Design a protein with these regions (language model features):
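Active-site-adjacent bridging/hinge elements
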Residues: 115-117, 220-225, 266-270, 329-341, ...
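A well-structured
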Residues: 1-284, 293
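Inter-helical turn/loop segments and adjacent helix faces that build the functional surface
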Residues: 233-234, 257, 261, 301-304, ...
């Protein structure tokens, strides 16, 4: 598909009924294939259909998170989440056709064992009995996202959202820091009844989903959904133990050094964000200037990173500044049909803005390369844990 500026990427509600018919037809072709060539062609037709829907979903999702107040994209996300959940039987049919294909070993030989391992695992957590709960799960996640995005509070004459308070939380004025943290807490206190109700329902819903599929609790199901084939709950428990025994004492030592640097008798929770008595090292310049400096850095880093970031800038594949109604946090996503990553963030005038241009860019660089070198879309991503090696590595590469 011809590349377009993100602001000009077209979105039209997809015909999910027609998508279902075509997906079922591709699954049947895969199941009835008489040769590996036929099976392979059917598999890639299925991928083409999924990428087409996935690209539209990603465009709608990004635009929804940019402004959660936009009624059009809010409704589109609701339509897509519900419609795709109802496609579960067709989704499972396609996976069963691949997993049970007589040409399974041919697929593994060409694309590696991971593709079929992921398919086999997904089959364990895909069931049409979960359709109502999957729909409700999507609704709850959207509601939580919107609730936090719309939260604002007056602070020193300015109406601030969560990200608007962050710079004040780093102030060299201790009272300002304390007031900012209390405003942050007050923001959460105001919306906590709704957030608590949403979270409670989500816990019960996910437990019910897991029990329906025969899992004793949600974590067992979630580990499979997240691609943790070898990394078990026992490994997580061992990691928590290491955090408590090794990392926590090291952090306590760093906090003590910070207390001394700040000249405080006691380091309080509202002091932790200020690293130096003279103030934190915050970025100078506008968003456009920061992006231009990042572009220069990536061009100097390597030919590959330069090409990648030039692509991001040329097609405006960012939405960086915090604003009213914008979802909290930061993320990288991708538009498969365009082989294009996208970076979402909430710039707020702190060093975190620079972190975004390295951390999220690390995710985006991995996606940019993977979409151009790996023919199977399902293999262009990884688990959340492995993905962080891409982002954190880029942070280290970018250090002076």
């Amino acid at each position: 598909m011809e590349m377009k500026d993100f602001r000009e990427m077209p979105y039209a509600r997809p015909d999910l009924e027609e998508y279902g018919k075509q997906a079922r037809k591709a699954a049947r072709r895969l199941r009835e294939a008489n040769s590996y060539a036929e099976a392979r062609e059917a598999c890639f037709e299925q991928q083409r259909l999924e990428n087409e829907i996935g690209t539209l979903y990603a465009i709608a999702s990004v635009r929804n998170t940019i402004d959660t107040r936009d009624a059009f994209y809010e409704e589109e996300i609701r339509y897509l989440q519900e419609g795709l959940a109802r496609m579960t039987p067709i989704e499972k049919e396609a996976m069963e056709a691949l997993a049970g294909s007589p040409f399974r070993k041919d697929f593994e030989k060409e694309f590696g064992a991971q593709l079929l391992k992921e398919t086999d695992t997904s089959l364990k957590t895909t069931d049409e009995r979960l359709i109502p709960d999957r729909i409700r799960e999507g609704e709850l996640c959207q509601a939580y996202q919107k609730e936090t995005a719309l939260a604002v509070i007056p602070f020193r004459g300015v109406e601030c959202n969560f990200y608007g308070l962050l710079k004040h939380m780093e102030s060299t004025d201790r009272m300002e820091r304390k007031e900012a943290f209390r405003a942050w807490a007050e923001l959460y206190a105001r919306i906590s009844p709704k957030l608590d109700a949403q979270y409670d329902e989500l816990v019960q819903l996910r437990t019910r989903m897991a029990n329906t599929l025969g899992f004793p609790s949600y974590p067992e199901m979630a580990y499979l959904q997240r691609g943790h084939y070898d990394y078990t709950q026992a490994d997580t428990a061992a990691f928590r133990k290491q955090i408590r025994e090794i990392v926590t004492p090291a952090v306590a030592e760093l906090r003590e050094r910070q207390r001394v640097r700040l000249g405080l008798d006691r380091l309080c929770y509202y002091d932790e964000a200020l690293l130096f008595a003279e103030g934190n090292a915050n970025p100078e310049g506008t968003t456009e200037e920061l992006v231009a400096k990042a572009q220069q850095m990536y061009q100097e880093m390597s030919a590959e990173t330069g090409e990648f970031f030039n692509f991001m800038v040329k097609y405006h594949l960012f939405d960086l500044e915090t604003r009213p109604g914008k979802r909290m946090g930061g993320y990288m996503t991708s538009f498969a049909d365009y082989q294009a990553p996208f970076i979402f963030s909430n710039f707020n005038g702190t060093s975190a803005d620079v972190d975004v241009l390295t951390h999220e860019a690390g995710h985006a660089f991995q996606g940019y390369l993977a979409m151009r070198s790996i023919p199977v879309s399902a293999l262009t991503g990884s688990t959340a844990e492995i993905n962080e090696t891409h982002s954190m590595s880029m942070e280290h590469f970018a250090y002076p």
